[in-house]
Swiss-Prot record:
One of its GO terms (biological process) is glutaminyl-tRNA aminoacylation. Its EC number is 6.1.1.18. This is Glutamine--tRNA ligase. Residues 1-635 are annotated as: Glutaminyl-tRNA synthetase. SUPFAM superfamilies: GatB/YqeY motif, Nucleotidylyl transferase, Ribosomal protein L25-like. Keywords: Aminoacyl-tRNA synthetase, ATP-binding, Cytoplasm, Ligase, Nucleotide-binding, Protein biosynthesis. In the N-terminal section; belongs to the class-I aminoacyl-tRNA synthetase family. In the C-terminal section; belongs to the GatB/GatE family. It comes from the Bacteria. It comes from Deinococcus radiodurans (strain ATCC 13939 / DSM 20539 / JCM 16871 / CCUG 27074 / LMG 4051 / NBRC 15346 / NCIMB 9279 / VKM B-1422 / R1).
Length: 852
C-alpha cells in the first residue's frame, strides 16, 4: 500500500486534486470506535528528550533567545511526501513544546521547477497533517531584494567575488579531498568590477552559467563546502511569483541561513547531509553580524523501506505512466495517502514512533502500515463485501430474512473509553444499538476461493458436502455445484442448517438480490524490494541528493536525466481491480466512511471517483487502504533479502542505532543485524507494547528484557503508558536490572499525567522518580512532602527578580536599551535561583514590570 490536541476533520473527502497527479514525538491517542469519538488529551512531552532539546533548554536557561522559533522549509518543486513528515512534525512539535513560534517557509529559489500548485498542495497537506503556522507563512522570494543587498555587502567587505570560469573549470579548480583548490584568474577582481558585474547579472545581460557569485572563504579548507561556494547563479527563467524581475537566484547555502536570520529562527534543524554546509551558515552569520543569530543543528535522516522520495524519480514515475499521477494511492506523497484513505492521526502516530538521533536510519515500512491498521481498527465499522463472487442458492430458504448484525467486534467495544461506539453517519451509541440490517436471501454471493471442489489439506471453508458458517446467518452445507467449460465453478446449491450443526470455518457473504455492485481497487506496495534506490538499485542510479535541496540548487540536477534502474523493482501487480458486491447498508453512509470489509481489509470510497462528472450515485468504487495483516513479512524480511544476495556489514560492538557511529552521514541499514531477532514470545510482547502506546525503540528494549517487562506489567494502560515506558528504558533500566528499584510502575501514571498537564516540569518529575526508585514512595507523595513543586508567592517572586536584576546591572541596562532578547537570560537566572519553582507566566510579567 501504498499527536497533541488535534482539532481535525475526520478524514473529509480529498478535495485538492492534483492534475493527474524523532525524538519520539507525542504519541497520538488511539482513536476510539467511530469517527466522532471524544478527543483525548495528548501525552507529554511533545518531543521526548534528545540532543536538540538539551541544546534548546540550555539556550533558554542562559537567556540566549527570548523564545524558540523553528521553521520547516519545503522546496515547492513537487508534492509533500512521507519523507517530510518526520522533519515537519519535529519542527512544529519542538516550537509548541517550548511555547515558541513555528514558521512555514517556501524555498522557492528555483524558478525552473517551483510552482504555485506545489505551494498550495504542500500547505494544504501540512494543514491536513495538523501543522499550524498562523500568520507565519513565508516565501524566500519575498526577500530577494534583501538577499541581493547582502550579496553587495559581502562584495564591499571583500568577502565575495564574481566568478567567470565555466562550470566544469570551476569544479576542477576546487580540487578534491587530497588536493587544495586553485584560485581562478577572477578571484582578485576589484570591488567596483565585482559590483558592476553582479548588477549586470541581475539586469539579465548574461547567459545562464556565464558568471556566478562566489564567497571568498578558503580554497585549502578540508571541508570542500568552504572552498568558495556559489552564492548566486544566473537563471534566465521567469519565476511564478516575481515573473521576469530577477535573472539571478540565490543558492541554498546563501538563502537558507539568511532567511533563518530574517525570520528570527533560533534553532534551524535539518538532516545530516547538511552537516558540512553548517560551516557556510556560520561564516555568513559572522560576516553579516546577525545578533542574535540562528544556529543549525543536524539530525539523522529517516528513510522508509519499499519507497522512494526523490522528487525527480517520483516525477519520472508519473511521466512514464507507471502511476496515474502524484495522487496515485501507491505513491508516498501525502496527497496520495489522503486519497488512499490514511488519516492524519495515523501518520502522526507513525511519526511518534521514530526517534531523533545523529544517525541516519531507514524505517521498516511495517511500522507505518501498522500505525494505519491500529488507527483504522478503532475507526472503521465492520461490513461485508464479496470481491470475487460465486453464487450460492439456499434451496430451503423461501423468503427473505433481515438480520441485525453489529458494526463492531468485542475488542473495540472493550477498549472504548466511554463505553460507546460510533455509527457510520456520526454520533455515538451503546454497543447494542450499533447494528445494521443485512438481508439474507435465497441467492447469495460468497468469495470464489471460499469454495474448493478439491480442497487441500487443512481447508476449513466450504467443500462439496461440507459445512461452513455464514457470518451472522447460520451454517450451510454445499450439496452440489456446477462448472463452465473451463472447469470454473459457476454456482453452488446449499442447504441452510440448524444451529445444532457444526462447522469449522466462518466466511462472509452478501445477498445476490440486494447487494450493491462495486469496483474494488486493491493497492499494494509500489516496490517489491526494501531499497529500490539504495542497496537493491543499479549502481549507476543516483540516490545521494538531499531531501529538499541538491548540492548546488538550481544547477540542473532536477532537470537532469534520471536513471530508470529503480523501475525494475516495481511490483508487477501493485494494483488489481475486481468487481463484486457490497452489502446494501453502505448506501446511506457518508462518502468518507472508512470500513473494514470483513476478512478483506480496510476500504473507503475513492474520493477522486466521487468527484468525476460522469460518476453515478450507484457507481461505487472502493480503494483498499491497507490489508488486515502484513502479507509481506516473510518475503520482505527474509526470503527477499536472500534472493537479492546481499551480505550485511558487520556491526559488532556498535549500538543498535549506530551502525556507522553517531555523526556519520552514512545511513544505517534497516535490516542490518543490530541485534538478535525477537523470539516469537518477545515479538508478541513487542506488538502488545506498541498497542499500548510505547515507542518502537522502547517496546523492543522492554520486550527483550524480563526485568523491564515485569516492571511495566504493573503500569496502567492509557495515555500515560508511553511516558512510563520511556522512563523505564531511560531512567530506571540500570536499577531494574540490578533489582534495586522499589517504586511501583502503577505509581508512575499520576506522575506522567502531571507532566502532560504542565503541572510538573520534566526536571522535577525525573528528580522525584529517582527518589521514588530508591525509597519506594510514590513520586507524587515525594513531590508534595518535600515541596519539590511548591510555587512561589508573588512577593517572594518579586524579591528574587529584584535580586537577579541587581546582580546583573549591565544586562538590565542593555535590555532597557532595546536588547529585549535578554529577557530569556533573566528568566533562566530566576528559574535557577528558585530551583524551577517560579510560574513562567507570573515570572514573565514580574520581569517586564521590574525591567520597565
Amino acid at each position: 500500500m501504498g499527536a497533541f490536541g488535534w482539532e481535525q476533520d475526520r478524514g473529509a473527502p480529498f478535495s485538492g486534486r492534483s492534475p493527474r497527479i524523532l525524538t519520539r514525538m507525542t504519541d497520538a491517542p488511539r482513536p476510539t470506535a467511530g469517527a466522532d469519538a471524544p478527543a483525548r488529551p495528548p501525552a507529554a512531552p511533545l518531543v521526548a528528550p534528545n540532543f536538540i532539546t538539551e541544546i534548546i533548554e540550555r539556550d533558554l536557561e542562559a537567556g540566549k533567545y527570548p523564545r524558540v522559533v523553528t521553521r520547516f522549509p519545503p522546496d515547492p518543486s513537487g508534492y509533500a511526501h512521507l519523507g517530510h513528515v518526520f522533519a515537519s512534525l519535529l519542527d512544529f512539535n519542538t516550537a509548541r513544546q517550548y511555547g515558541g513560534q513555528f514558521n512555514l517557509r517556501m524555498d522557492d529559489t528555483n524558478p525552473e521547477l517551483a510552482r504555485q500548485e506545489y505551494v498550495d498542495s504542500i500547505a494544504d497537506d501540512l494543514k491536513w497533517l495538523g501543522l499550524d503556522w498562523g500568520e507565519h507563512f513565508y516565501y524566500a522570494s519575498d526577500y530577494f531584494d534583501r538577499y541581493y543587498a547582502y550579496a553587495e555587502q559581502l562584495i564591499r567587505q571583500g568577502d565575495a567575488y564574481v566568478e567567470s570560469v565555466s562550470p566544469e573549470e570551476l569544479s576542477r579548480l576546487r580540487g578534491n579531498a587530497t588536493t587544495p583548490g586553485t584560485p581562478s584568474p577572477y578571484r582578485d577582481r576589484s570591488v567596483e568590477e565585482n559590483l558592476d558585474l553582479l548588477r549586470r547579472m541581475k539586469a539579465g545581460e548574461f547567459a545562464d552559467g556565464e558568471h556566478v557569485l562566489r564567497a571568498k572563504i578558503d580554497l585549502t579548507a578540508p571541508n570542500m563546502k568552504l572552498r568558495d561556494p556559489v552564492l548566486y547563479r544566473i537563471v534566465n527563467k521567469p519565476h511564478f511569483r516575481t515573473s521576469d524581475e530577477w535573472h539571478i537566484y540565490p543558492a541554498y547555502d546563501f538563502e537558507h541561513p539568511l532567511q533563518d536570520a530574517i525570520e528570527g529562527v533560533t534553532h534551524s534543524m535539518c538532516s545530516l547531509e547538511f552537516v558540512d554546509n553548517r560551516a557556510i551558515y556560520d561564516w555568513l552569520m559572522e560576516k553579516l553580524n546577525f545578533d542574535p543569530r540562528p544556529h543549525q543543528y543536524e539530525f539523522g535522516r529517516r528513510g522508509l523501506e519499499y519507497t522512494i522520495t526523490s522528487k525527480r524519480k517520483l516525477r519520472e514515475l508519473v511521466q512514464a505512466g507507471r502511476v496515474s499521477g502524484w495522487d496515485d494511492p501507491r505513491m508516498p506523497t501525502l496527497r496520495a495517502q489522503r486519497r488512499l484513505g490514511v488519516t492524519p492521526e495515523a501518520v502522526r502516530a507513525f511519526a511518534a514512533q521514530i526517534g531523533v538521533s545523529r544517525t541516519n536510519r531507514t524505517v521498516d515500512i511495517a511500522v507505518y502500515e501498522n500505525a494505519v491498521r491500529d488507527d483504522l481498527n478503532h475507526r472503521a465499522p465492520r461490513v461485508m463485501a464479496v470481491l470475487d463472487p460465486v453464487k450460492v442458492t439456499l434451496t430451503n430458504l423461501d423468503g427473505e430474512k433481515t438480520l441485525s448484525l453489529p458494526y463492531w467486534p468485542h475488542d473495540v467495544v472493550r477498549d472504548s473509553p466511554d463505553g460507546l461506539v460510533g455509527m457510520p453517519g456520526g454520533g455515538r451509541v451503546a454497543p447494542e444499538e450499533a447494528v445494521r440490517d443485512v438481508p439474507l436471501t435465497r441467492e447469495l454471493y460468497i468469495e470464489r476461493d471460499d469454495f474448493s471442489p478439491a480442497p487441500p489439506k487443512g481447508f476449513k471453508r466450504l467443500t462439496p458436502g461440507g459445512t461452513v458458517r455464514l457470518r451472522g446467518a447460520g451454517i450451510i452445507r454445499a450439496d452440489d455445484f456446477g462448472t463452465d467449460e473451463a472447469g470454473q465453478v459457476t454456482h453452488i446449491r446449499a442447504t441452510l442448517l440448524g444451529e445444532d450443526a457444526k462447522a469449522a470455518g466462518v466466511i462472509h457473504w452478501v445477498s445476490a438480490e440486494r447487494a450493491l455492485p462495486a469496483e474494488f481497487r486493491l493497492y499494494d506496495r509500489l516496490f517489491r524490494v526494501p531499497h529500490p534506490e539504495g542497496e537493491n538499485a543499479d549502481v549507476e542510479d543516483d540516490s545521494a541528493g538531499p531531501a529538499e535541496h541538491e548540492a548546488e540548487p538550481g544547477a540542473g540536477q532536477e532537470t537532469a536525466p534520471v536513471s530508470q534502474g529503480f523501475m525494475r523493482y516495481l511490483t508487477p501487480d501493485s494494483l488489481r481491480v475486481l468487481r463484486g458486491y457490497v452489502e446494501p447498508s453502505v448506501a446511506g453512509d457518508p462518502a468518507d466512511t472508512r470500513y473494514q470489509f470483513e476478512r478483506q481489509g480496510y476500504f473507503w470510497r475513492d474520493p477522486v471517483e466521487l468527484e468525476r462528472v460522469d460518476s453515478r450515485e450507484d457507481a461505487l468504487v472502493f480503494g483498499r487502504i491497507i490489508t488486515l495483516k502484513d502479507t509481506w513479512g516473510k518475503q520482505g524480511g527474509g526470503t527477499q533479502q536472500k534472493a537479492e544476495g546481499k551480505k550485511r556489514p558487520s556491526t559488532k560492538g556498535r549500538g543498535p542505532d549506530e551502525v556507522r557511529g553517531e555523526g556519520s552521514s552514512s545511513p544505517a541499514k534497516a535490516h542490518a543485524p543490530k541485534a538478535q531477532p525477537l523470539t516469537p514470545e518477545q515479538d508478541a510482547e513487542f506488538t502488545r507494547l506498541l498497542g499500548l502506546g510505547a515507542s518502537e525503540g522502547d517496546a523492543r528494549t522492554i520486550a527483550r528484557d524480563p526485568a523491564l517487562l515485569a516492571f511495566v506489567g504493573g503500569a496502567a494502560p492509557g495515555d500515560t503508558f508511553a511516558q512510563v515506558a520511556s522512563w523505564t528504558v531511560n531512567e530506571l533500566v540500570a536499577g531494574l536490572r540490578a533489582g534495586e528499584v522499589k517504586v511501583r510502575a502503577a505509581d508512575l501514571a499520576p506522575l506522567a499525567e502531571g507532566v502532560a498537564s504542565g503541572q510538573l516540569s520534566a526536571r522535577i518529575a525525573r528528580e522525584a522518580l529517582a527518589r521514588a526508585a530508591a525509597s519506594g514512595d510514590a513520586p507524587l507523595t515525594i513531590i508534595e512532602r518535600e515541596g519539590l513543586n511548591a510555587g512561589l508567592s508573588a512577593e517572594a517572586l518579586q524579591q528574587v527578580v529584584a535580586q537577579v536584576i541587581a546582580a546583573n546591572p549591565d544586562k538590565a541596562e542593555a535590555y532597557r536599551g532595546g536588547k529585549t532578547a535578554l529577557l530569556g537570560f533573566f528568566t533562566g537566572q530566576v528559574m535557577r535561583a528558585t530551583a524551577g519553582k517560579a510560574d513562567p507566566q507570573a515570572l514573565a510579567a514580574a520581569l517586564k514590570d521590574a525591567l520597565a
